[in-house]
């Protein structure tokens, strides 16, 4: 692209210039009128060249005389196409115009000439479009979106030569940064060329697009020769959930947030290679609740929200020199909801900080309705101490960053020592329009009033000139001072113009005598916009001489003497205030002079591995200290080591005669250990004054959370509530004497739980039980057995409360009313009445509004007509939308909203409505080969693989229930049969569970004797497994030998399972606690279960215990008899304990179940009812729940903590090298499809980190197990499933269901405006989860052009004619048929011989089940009335791992008139609603009621 000369087209400029009369004793003022508002105004550094953009026309203008004259930038293709205008932050010659149509322009000579470049990118507000290299101005990243129709994806371009060439860096990145992102990054560290080239990018997770799985990748080769390496943020490990990166001074920061918490972890690097987690003195750092402030060259300053965001206040922290340890400077800083903080460092002067804090912070914490009383404070020692601002004897308070009234800095400029602000004296800050203009010329020590009323202000000529303009309305004049604001003069704007001032600015270094004022004026009905040049250059003032300057100390101590900071005193040569001269050193900034000081305590900081003591006077070890080579051969030995202090890097203090805190000291070797290693398992047993426990739940600390607690809350049978913060070693009763009737853990945030009473008063914790706060509900909880609290998936503090109104007498006027709060109950607002359930619908997968709410409301607000409408709103029901008029229930999941819709008549089948965006619904097409005369019941199963799974009941006779699992396409509307005859119990739960941590693996129990069951026989069960997300199912392969080395009584065929010999496991419906799943989210590939080998599943009392280490392909018997199990430390510890029989011992394995050791944990036999650990299974602590039953037993239920932390084999941290993942304690494991020899699963080869079983170390915090998605595989039959109205045949092919037709394939042409073609049905469709490319295209064989798209079709398929087309079609079909026949004849049972209608048993939940709700929903109109035991942690839904949340078809719950009635109730089960919130269910009376939704 050739360089084009800029055409100065004055005639094209839609502007008019007005100039005031030239006077020698006043400034010359020139006004230029624009028809539209000018934006993006900036100066090129060290020049009078200014640019701006017309916000409406998309034109760009330039002035070469500091704004007196303006010309349009006239380039080919530019007119009207400018989208945004940007200056380079460090190169004074460069600027960029980003265009609307893929064309963009860059100048390298201050807009004299421009170079055009192309990049197909659209710019949204979510990303900064230009990211600059800190040391090479030709290196720039350009990031935005590439869109085709409505489909957009992120794209990042890069250039290394100033956009002479442009290449794509990476697609789908959510933000990129150069490692060297500031001019001083890496100074003094001798960074390698690799780091200079390094780019960090946030990219989606390998298996999930959600932000909780974001990864931070870096590349030193622009992602050309590699796909990037994950940044080792946390002790050498990668971290998931990276949400943003930022650069400040010499630091690069990355913030990460784990799923199910709002707390962030902040990671810092000062060299682009070594990262450290920042510690904030125990302070939580919340998402969108911290602000990185202007920092120094030797520390980072961050303000962290301390309390509720509805009235935000913060705490100011300052880091040590490497950014790892932060100490608090001042609490209760004033913030606003946008994250702006009232904080500013005084320009050019080290150590002076102005902040605003909240005086009445205690009142504000109590109520968000209290208005903040803000006061101003100043620090002269880098934030160590603060003091009030003083105007005479009065305290002065100034408006700051949260009330920006101008561009640039608020108070200061490069003019040494001059500071200004708008505010007032008195007790606290008043409204801006009640303020006056104040000035200080001694850097904030003393202040005086400059002008009455609020003004914008700016400094020029190094402070010799101050200009101010009225800022409370329109004005026709400016004010200026030539003596530091002591005296003021006025000058009128030309031609009688009166404007509302918007911006008052000057060149960035404040060394010139020219200013620019931007404002607007209204004449008649038109708004006119002006850019006004104010020039003092022609005033009759002499040039200052040597005697006109003074040596001015930048900082004074309490004795008014020059003060030391960073080892020196700072001085400036500054013009005296009262002399009559101008400095006239344009573009020459004032240069500070430094005088060194002797070292003092303030010149030192804590050394690596040390933190400040509680009193702040010393530095103490933060962790075990490194041992010098050859030292510490004995525990009591001594060695010379760090004192805990070091001189702050960059500090220039004089060592001789000064303090020497960093001198090495003699240390004892015990400092090198934090906790002595006993080498043994530690046991702690705690008894409670109750016979049993009613429930427990974990408030799990996530990886991004601060602290080391492992918090459990437990409820006894006596309704006492206990909490432990150390996983059961120490317990404390909470709320003694209070009548807590419900405990509601937050559905989406594990740090939060609510404790409710029947009156509506309650408490909540936001920090896993460390603190509890009180709140008051708007009305008492509802009495209709409905969930009381509903939560927002992304906004932690947003609640919906469903309470009871007019219910004192329980008459017909009693009804439910929903209220909402956006500040965790501090304020409540009416939402809707006569509701059954309301729910926030926002999910990250949907583009819906945060305010989108669905409610079920009785039609005409009349609950007697039994018609429930499904309504939605995004404005809190100021307006509403009716989706369905008569529903049974609805369920929300990550990707789908599913609604059970009633027919017009009671005997009609239910219909299924589906939406992916919460706005548009469509009826689902269910497969005809699911032979159900009338569809009465659905169970919505887990749906996280871009497809919804439903269990459709086929037989609903009590104790004989079974049904079919059907699976949807990617938008949830078209379903195919996945598995027939799947067992279901009376409550609607199905024997179906997905394996956690691995894609597409699931197990289900089917009924193997359907024909007999239909005649009234008892169900017999078989276990099936799928490795391709339900497309194909097979029996489980039994072990070749049992745990004692003996053969089983039945035999397999060639090592493969048969109908007569397979492994069968007890499943979901037989569990006392649904959280006891086969698998763990962190123990990849490992599952345990109890069952037997044979033709069918036998009694649970006859079961043995089995394990798989390869995702269910092969199994091994662990021990005879049935055991309860739990995974710890991500599977590096597995603990099993006998189920339903007394024991003194447990067994544990440290090598994934290959070998087991016995451990005695009690002297008295105990009956263990459950074993638990944190839901992520990453802890080395376990809890056994049970009672002593042997001789010498103690009364009461006990919780036994089993701690493996000191076990010598699990005391050292495992080492993971992200660049060489198999170099140390881990290896890469590839899951396999049992029927594909090439190792492909869902069209790719995935590699997972797994600890080597023989390594004696612990994993610790949750590991990012998935290392990479390797080769993309060619498509095979396993990447397809049968299409709608097709069913699998015995040979594995798909054939039409007799008498039915496939969906009309031409519908795609009308449903998708971008579609060019449609394909004839083949009977196959791609599994939504597959990533395969090429190979067998079983779903697309014969294409046809969509109407009016023939031309595009021919371009897409040139030359596809005749014989060529025949072979393209016939070859895949023939090959697929041949392979299908070969596999079928060689492997008996690959397709499981599944007979339509087979079904399986599911036993009942135990009579003492603690369940109140779990994440399964029965959308059914047929389930028998079931009441609930309300004292079960409703948190169960969040940790049950086989099902997604879906509300229940029966949500009736038992009510109780007394604690005794409650305690006596057994065997009752509640409606299954994942946001059902009741734990304690004491109510007003004790009777059963039939549900009003057709329950029988």
Swiss-Prot record:
It comes from the Eukaryota. Residues 1384-1409 are cytoplasmic. BNR repeats lie at residues 61-71, 377-387, 438-448, 480-489, 722-732, 819-829, 1106-1116, 1147-1157. GO terms for biological process: Golgi to endosome transport; Golgi to vacuole transport; protein targeting to vacuole. Pfam families: Sortilin-Vps10, Sortilin_C. The keyword Transmembrane applies. Glycans are attached at residues 190, 297, 322, 971. Residues 1-21 form the signal peptide. InterPro entries: Sortilin_C, Sortilin_N, VPS10, VPS10-sortilin, WD40/YVTN_repeat-like_dom_sf. Its main location: Golgi. The keyword Plastid does not apply. It is found in: Golgi apparatus, trans-Golgi network membrane; Prevacuolar compartment membrane. One of its GO terms (cellular component) is cytosol. Residues 22-1362, 1431-1496 are lumenal. Keywords: Glycoprotein, Golgi apparatus, Membrane, Protein transport, Receptor, Repeat, Signal, Transmembrane, Transmembrane helix, Transport. The chain crosses the membrane at residues 1363-1383, 1410-1430. It is a multi-pass membrane protein. Belongs to the VPS10-related sortilin family. Functions as a sorting receptor in the Golgi compartment required for the intracellular sorting and delivery of soluble vacuolar proteins, like carboxypeptidase Y (CPY) and proteinase A. Executes multiple rounds of sorting by cycling between the late Golgi and a prevacuolar endosome-like compartment. This is Vacuolar protein sorting/targeting protein 10. It comes from Paracoccidioides brasiliensis (strain Pb03). The lineage of its organism: Eukaryota, Fungi, Dikarya, Ascomycota, Pezizomycotina.
